[in-house]
Amino acid sequence: MSRIPQPEVHVERRLTPGGVDRPRLRSTAAAFTSLVAVAATSLVAGPAVADPAGPCALPRTTAHHSLGLDTWNASYPRPARTLDAVMVFLSFPDAAPRIEPADLVADHFPATSRFFERASYGKFALHPHPRLQWIDMPRASTDYAIKRDWEPAMRTAYLRDALAVADPVIDFSRYDVVYLVADPDAPGVDSDATKVVNFDHPLTADGTDIKRVVTVFERHPPDRNVLAHETGHVFDLPDLYHRPTDGKGDWDTHVGDWDVMGSQFGLSPDLFGWHKWKLGWLGGRQVSCVKPIGSSMLTLEPLDAAPPAGASAGTRLAVVRTGEHSALAIEARGSTGNDATTCTEGVLIYRVRGGTESGGGPIEVVDTHPDSEACWDQSVYPPLADAPLGVGETFTVPGEGTKVEVADRTRTGAWTVKVTTGV
């Protein structure tokens, strides 16, 4: 990949008394005057909203972005309805913008909205509301020392200034998502610094809580699907890439091209079925809980394919519960929708760990062809590009006692799969 992905950061704040002379600013600037920004590994689990997810659903844990889905973390907006996103464009006194905000909007929209529309089968709409004027920051871009592993004090100063200058012209109470977009041509802007910033304690502006913002420092044109990846964090989805402790090595060993939360450059960026289940886009008969002992015959519709108008979506995800906080997920991946550039079609198997932190490997794709690779000139991780099983192939998942056999493919493109557990 052309650049290393960035995990989120969390900002902890301590409120202290502080007056402001503009009543509309309320606590936004006042709160930021005492921000202490720290990189954290987890957050306390937010309030739960009951969700009838079924017997094979893993319980949500305190792990940051836990893939447990028996309840929804109400600290995050659930994308099961229309959500509104504001785009705020920030310029700096050390650089006159060479591009119009409208051009930066076009870098990300409607592509990001269409990504989520396809992934959700039309159940979710993300509506951008760009303010098509530059808002001047009070300090030079170089003063903030913007970079990938940003110094917390500098990040705090940037966020403080950005929200302070935006507040007089933006009514934050109208929006569910906030994108702070920096002038890509300013000398101090580093495209590797794009990420979501979470506030351990929400800020209040215009009578609404601001719990997180997306800081966008992308070049023009930007990396593909970058805003879809970052927006996924806003909806409580984890990073699926592997970050080597020494900063070296391959980042894509966990999921390869599969799912935009692993790599925004992946050939198969559609969200995993497990993610769609968590977000409320799959449910009921679309998820099959496989019995713990015995064999089950399933017909899996391709996850990426939109159901015909007025027709049932069919079964999209099969789940084998393997432990209190673990499961095997089985889904069919095709070459339509968000996966139009996929390397390999077939039945994909992956492990899910509900107690594993974002960035720690909460999902691991099972390589059913460990002795081969595919699309070496395009894939972010060729060893997993051919991970799915094809028709006539059988694979027993190591250590899980589960065998998956792809028996056939129907005329409509669905996959007939036999899953045997307890082997």
Predicted features and spans:
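Zn2+-dependent metallopeptidase catalytic core
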Residues: 51-220, 228, 246, 405
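Active-site-proximal beta-strand/loop segments in catalytic clefts of secreted hydrolases
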Residues: 88-93, 181-185, 237-240, 262-266, ...
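Short, solvent-exposed loop/turn segments at the edges of secondary structure
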Residues: 82, 254-256, 344
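Extracellular hydrolytic enzyme modules, especially secreted metalloproteases
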Residues: 172, 177, 185-339
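Short, solvent-exposed loop/turn elements at domain surfaces
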Residues: 94-100, 268-273, 338-340, 358
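Secretory targeting and sorting signals
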Residues: 3-5, 14-50
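Non-catalytic C-terminal accessory/binding modules of secreted extracellular proteins
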Residues: 3, 57-69, 200-217, 298-423
